[in-house]
Amino acid sequence: MENTEVKVGIADLNLVSSPNKIMTIGLGSCIGIALYDRRSKLAGLSHIMLPDSTQFKNVTNPMKFADLAIPLLIKKMEAKGCQKRNLIAKIAGGASMFSFSDKSMVGDIGKRNIQAVKKSLSEERIQIIAEDVGGNKGRTMILDALDGKVTLKIVGIGIVEL
């Protein structure tokens, strides 16, 4: 059986089953949320851009927001036979990519994304078992559905496993 590597774009999500991998690139202030079910060997990955959809009148893409994308990813995994109680999470991203002297104008979107993702996963009762968040480096995230291992390629640092 040939394994494939499925790509998840910005403000997108997808699922793969073993022995496939799923990846996303360009995690700056964005966050990659990797959900994994050891029993079914199903892996889900979401690439969120913003913390909270309630600040917007028209939400055309729920996958852009932590508060909407995480429940949507869980529902898609449950539709494939996962039980939410078996899911574990690993997260990466949330960097401060720009240094502004006055962060009050834009806020620290990376930090707000981290907080929103942790809040949403906590509300869903999904444990975060590993994370690589914050800092000021971009990341690529690869989730292996065979064993749930996450490999990060961090700009200027190298490869880190979660």
Curated annotation (Swiss-Prot):
**So what EC number does this one have?**
3.5.1.44
> From what superkingdom does this record's organism come?
Bacteria
* One GO process term, biological-process aspect: chemotaxis
**So what does this thing catalyse?**
L-glutaminyl-[protein] + H2O = L-glutamyl-[protein] + NH4(+)
Enumerate the UniProt keywords alphabetically.
Chemotaxis, Hydrolase
Entry-linked InterPro entries:
CheD-like_sf (IPR038592), Chemorcpt_Glu_NH3ase_CheD (IPR005659), Cytotoxic_necrot_fac-like_cat (IPR011324)
Q: Name one GO molecular function term.
A: protein-glutamine glutaminase activity
Pfam families named in the record: CheD (PF03975)
Q: What NCBIfam families does its record include? A: PRK13490.1 (NF010015)
Q: Which family does it belong to?
A: Belongs to the CheD family.
Protein task? Probably deamidates glutamine residues to glutamate on methyl-accepting chemotaxis receptors (MCPs), playing an important role in chemotaxis.
Write the protein's name. Answer: Probable chemoreceptor glutamine deamidase CheD
Q: Which gene encodes it?
A: cheD
